[in-house]
From Swiss-Prot:
Region feature Beta, mapped onto this chain: 1-28
Keywords: Metal-binding, Metal-thiolate cluster
Keyword Repeat appears in the UniProt entry: no
Domain notes: Class I metallothioneins contain 2 metal-binding domains: four divalent ions are chelated within cluster A of the alpha domain and are coordinated via cysteinyl thiolate bridges to 11 cysteine ligands. Cluster B, the corresponding region within the beta domain, can ligate three divalent ions to 9 cysteines.
Residues holding a divalent metal cation 3: 14, 18, 23, 28
Protein name: Metallothionein
Molecular function terms, GO-annotated: metal ion binding
Binding site for a divalent metal cation 4: 32-33, 43, 47
Domain of life: Eukaryota
Gene it is expressed from: mt
Length: 60
């Protein structure tokens, strides 16, 4: 289950930094909004993105 409930009263900011405000998540998931640049296939399946760019450290 996705612990991020930004759509239920919080805001998910996934520009340069993946952060959510007024919600229970500390990392931004694809189900909130895309953290990684478009065209990053390994971030397209809902994993937690940790960073600004699409590289080996992007997803855990």
């Amino acid at each position: 289950m996705d612990p991020c409930e930004c759509s239920k009263g919080g805001t998910c900011n996934c520009g340069g930094s993946c952060t959510c405000t007024n919600c229970s998540c500390t990392t931004c998931k694809k189900s909130c909004c895309p953290c990684c640049p478009s065209g990053c296939p390994k971030c397209a399946s809902g994993c937690v993105c940790k960073g600004k760019t699409c590289d080996a450290a992007c997803c855990q």
